[in-house]
Amino acid sequence: MTTPAPLTGLLPLNPEQLARLQAATTDLTPEQLAWVSGFFWGVLNPRSGAVAVTPAPDGKMPGVTLISASQTGNARRVAEALRDDLLAANLNVTLVNAGDYKFKQIASEKLLVIVTSTQGEGEPPEEAVALHKFLFSKKAPKLENTAFAVFSLGDTSYEFFCQSGKDFDSKLAELGGERLLDRVDADVEYQAAASEWRACVVDVLKSRAPVAVPSQSVATGAVNDIHTSPYTKDAPLTATLSVNQKITGRNSEKDVRHIEIDLGDSGLRYQPGDALGVWYQNDPALVKELVELLWLKGDEPVMVDGKTLPLAEALEWHFELTVNTANIVENYATLTRSESLLPLVGDKAQLQHYAATTPIVDMVRFSPAQLDAQALIDLLRPLTPRLYSIASAQAEVESEVHITVGVVRYDIEGRARAGGASSFLADRVEEEGEVRVFIEHNDNFRLPANPQTPVIMIGPGTGIAPFRAFMQQRAADGAEGKNWLFFGNPHFTEDFLYQVEWQRYVKEGLLSRIDLAWSRDQKEKIYVQDKLREQGAELWRWINDGAHIYVCGDARRMAADVEKALLEVIAEFGGMDLESADEYLSELRVERRYQRDVY
């Protein structure tokens, strides 16, 4: 097991101490790590009465292994809440991130609970990819002695809704596991379903416990003060937008903004690799258009979470208007008896296509109907914050946080449409205006603990963002490890994001190599994956020398194309077939030497 490194400048450990600590804990199981954590806590708190973590006594109910497989933090929050519920019920539980779980020990699990999200085209979260591959490989063991439960989080606006949870649930059963209870698939508004499921899990496990025993377990994983903050997704910090700068050229087809947010004296802290959550306000003009299309005024009272609000205010601040879903289309068609939409009902593929190509306001414009205000509210999904990879390191920018925002803009029959959060930041928040933010920590995208370790960064488009943070941190730490950047975009003159900074890093010697792919500057399109193949021999030398590989950006196409190129490079220059190359890359993932932040 490899524990991701915390920000060295913020901890009382130097890089060498961190490296020794990681080496000492490499072969420990989650239970052993938990015991060590409890032991040292007890050393520091001898009078606290704390109980060190120990295995469940003979004859008692076996401990519950609770695996959190999270992409944006929601699955982690559900898993942490379940852990607290189980501890309160005096049940023995170990919470472990999927990326830290030694999956080859799964055959020895008696009680296994998985909370997982889904990303991309139905793939598991990044931290759970290795576990998923192992379970679906020929090496997967029989699990006749394992009882399990799965909670799956997803988004019905995507075709492969909750696919990761479905995969884990079906495979665990296929391997002989016993279901403790049926899998639950939860949409974006997951809280109520999660609360009910957690209660069911506790009840089922308590019914299996022969004797109530004092709880003796804690969550595993690195403890880091940087995660402790009064500001959360549900209680965000009101910060100040200080800089909004367009960093693509005048003739670029893309509108990309460099956004700087002043955190003031909040004390909010983050690490390179983390994301910034941004709560946004829907465009008042869009709200007005939707309200008028439904022959409403906007001042009608509606109920939102037990409170009465004017319709327009509810739509601006509380509901998703820029992303349509198949469920919304189907429900709107059924509710309004729309002649143009009713033929789509029951046809999942057509509903998905219509939702993906027709925003809510245009659905109403194309299929007008008279709807009362509360019916409209009941049709919509709650507004959720958008996450942006952080493009700065606090070692350099201190009380600021920077993000790189690709503004979503398009036309529907001549009418300008835009993304909710991106247009909010780019167009509607004035400089020195307020924006509500929080940090979403991502321990699955961390710089190596050893500053001598080489780093390979692959980030086309706005995927460049976290690597700006990486380089700022490596510069601040005086890290001597080599750094190699692969970046791509349509045009060199218009789309070279942060060009001056990269050129400075090259000149200073911090950026050892940079390979650039401009897809539209020549007849033949060139992408970052082509550059990977072109530099295959040198790339393999870096990998063979222990380099860590990082990929950030589009999950739907780029990440898959990049992984295919990496596999081909490993196979060709590592002297392997593709199956062996895939196993090799999986090992790199387990060792945290291959990390992705894709969306």
From Swiss-Prot:
One annotated GO molecular function: FMN binding
This chain's function reads:
Component of the sulfite reductase complex that catalyzes the 6-electron reduction of sulfite to sulfide. This is one of several activities required for the biosynthesis of L-cysteine from sulfate. The flavoprotein component catalyzes the electron flow from NADPH -> FAD -> FMN to the hemoprotein component.
Ordered alphabetically, the record's keywords are: Amino-acid biosynthesis, Cysteine biosynthesis, Electron transport, FAD, Flavoprotein, FMN, NADP, Oxidoreductase, Transport
Cross-referenced PANTHER family, in alphabetical order? NADPH OXIDOREDUCTASE A, NITRIC OXIDE SYNTHASE-RELATED
- Name of encoding gene: cysJ
Amino-acid positions noted as binding FAD in the UniProt annotation, renumbered to this chain: 322, 356, 386-389, 404-406, 410, 419-422, 599
Q: Which organism is it from?
A: Salmonella typhi
Its protein name is Sulfite reductase [NADPH] flavoprotein alpha-component
Q: Name one GO biological process term.
A: hydrogen sulfide biosynthetic process
